[in-house]
Curated annotation (Swiss-Prot):
Residues 300-336 are annotated as: Disordered. GO terms for cellular component: cytoplasm. It comes from Salmonella typhimurium (strain LT2 / SGSC1412 / ATCC 700720). The keyword ATP-binding does not apply. The keyword Acyltransferase does not apply. This is Surface presentation of antigens protein SpaN. Keywords: Cytoplasm, Virulence. Coiled coil: none annotated. Residues 319-328 have a biased composition (Low complexity). Belongs to the SpaN family.
């Protein structure tokens, strides 16, 4: 195999082809000789019985190749008989077993003892820490490949769908649904959060606010002059109402309505059939809707004769022929 650190640009480990298996022993020896001097200062390097010193970045592709292909099948790449080939294959497998053990030990040993986190957190944290005595971009790529494989294996066996585990290495949370940043909501939590935010401005709250504003208006009784002084007397009005010199308008018990924010004033001395419905339009403006034409005539004559600057009467024959507007220009309310 030509390059012992065969790692593609995407991080996938490239295993040797079948025709390259025969040169595995030579490649292993060359790799050991090449990296022996580079990692001579690393006290954690191991000896492998055959005076081979192997670092874990170099061990990864050779380990995978040895376990996949086993002993060499072509004799022209080696010197010796069949028994020598068999012995050579066993030696490589024995080295591969030691490489596997040392790779696991060294991955854990790179994490400081005072961190004391689980294995998956340690492997993830070691990816973000600078490694001492490691040179070359290919070696770093091999290290990341080792940690990625270990991380996927640990997460698949140690984390269930109902358990979310925080990894302090780079502030990630791993769940059965995938990996997300700490503090970010899961996909199943996004829909309820948006629905709760959308319900904050319900129209019921606005209607309640309008009713509250109308209920704070002063409910003072309004007096109307003697009915005999209004329009010369209407024959259709009740006699009991015409005989009274003075009357007072009081709000009834059904004063404020929650739906349309209106007040209903009933003329108690006239009877329950005579009333005025007052609806709030905007600041200082109200709409008065008489119950019948008799009440409309009385109010119209009173406003024209009493205080035309204070009262303003309008009619809309298309929408509501009995609709009237009341414009309030001063803060105090005088008797009509």
């Amino acid at each position: 195999m030509g390059d012992v650190s065969a790692v593609s640009s995407s991080g996938n480990i490239l295993l040797p082809q079948q025709d390259e298996v025969g040169g595995l022993s030579e490649a292993l020896k060359k790799a050991v000789e090449k990296h022996k001097t580079e990692y001579s200062g690393d006290k954690k390097d191991r000896d492998y019985g055959d005076a081979f010193v192997m670092h874990k970045e170099t061990a990864l592709p050779l380990l995978l190749a040895a376990w996949r292909h086993g002993a060499p099948a072509k004799s022209e790449h080696h010197n010796g008989n069949v028994s020598g080939l068999h012995h050579n294959g066993k030696s490589e497998l024995r080295i591969a077993e030691k490489l596997l053990k040392v790779t696991a030990e060294k991955s854990v040993g790179l994490i400081s003892a005072e961190a004391k986190v689980d294995k998956s957190a340690a492997l993830l944290s070691s990816k973000n820490r600078p490694l001492e005595s490691v040179s070359g971009k290919k070696l770093s790529a091999d290290l990341k490949a080792v940690e990625s494989v270990s991380e996927v294996t640990d997460n698949a066996t140690g984390i269930s769908d109902d358990n979310i585990k925080a990894l302090p290495g780079d502030n990630k949370a791993i769940a059965g649904e995938g990996v997300r940043k700490e503090g970010a909501p899961l996909a199943r939590d996004v829909a309820p959060a948006r629905m709760a935010a959308a319900n904050t401005g319900k129209p019921e709250d606005k209607d309640h606010k309008k009713v509250k504003d109308v209920s704070q208006l002063p409910l003072q009784p309004t007096t109307i002059a003697d009915l005999s002084q209004l329009t010369g007397g209407d024959e259709k009005m009740p006699l009991a109402a015409q005989s009274k010199p003075m009357m007072t308008i009081f709000p009834t018990a059904d004063g404020v309505k929650g739906e349309d924010s209106s007040l209903t004033y009933r003329f108690q001395r006239w009877g329950n059939d005579y009333s005025v419905n007052i609806q709030a339009r905007q600041a200082g403006e109200f709409s008065l809707i008489p119950s019948n034409t008799q009440v409309e005539h009385r109010l119209h004559d009173q406003w024209q004769n009493g205080n035309p600057q204070r009262w303003h009467l309008t009619r809309d024959d298309q929408q509501n022929p009995q609709q009237q507007q009341h414009r309030q220009q001063s803060g105090e309310e005088d008797d009509a």
